[in-house]
Amino acid sequence: MEETLVFVDEGFLARLSKYFGNGKYIKFDKISFIKNIAKKKDLFVKHTFYATAPPFQGTPPSEDEKKRKEGYDKFKNKFSNRKDFTFLEGRVQRTKNKEGIFQYRQKGVDTVMTMALSSFRADYPTIKKIILIACDTDFCPILEMLKSKGIEIILASYYERKRNTEFSRSHHLIDCSSEYIKLTKEDFLNFKLEK
């Protein structure tokens, strides 16, 4: 099997699992999920780059924030000894909206993913195909650059034609890719973890 690298936007993956779980996150084996996406294209995962952000921590952190951080650290530690898995970390920003309600947004996650996409050839010069699990059109410039250098981009994402839905994004990211795999609920359920 030909080797590939997989680049994962965890924020997108989490939103999609919640969407397919009808408002509840589907807990699933991420490594098996990623390997299965590659297997659909007869590819072997050489390395995964997983872009995420640790949960927001106030000063001092609340009990809920501490609990979220413990869960994140436990999740991250599961992968810390794997040589085929790299965490790319941004941060979470907390702001208040006009109604005084806190809102949380990931910051820098797309940037660290773009950095990894732009530099992987130094460590993996023989890779000719990569898989991107994301939905953000901000990745189009780097994808276009990679395609111009002979890299095939396989986008694994979810897109709906219905306007004003959570996944009714621009078709532009699909157009920037070489191939498109539409993720399904079954992709998650096939690797569902029991509590």
Which residue stretches match the model-derived regions?
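Domain-level signal for Mg2+-assisted phosphodiester chemistry and nucleotide/NA-binding surfaces
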Residues: M1-R105, E152, Y159-K162
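Nuclease catalytic cores that cleave nucleic-acid phosphodiester bonds
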Residues: T86-K195
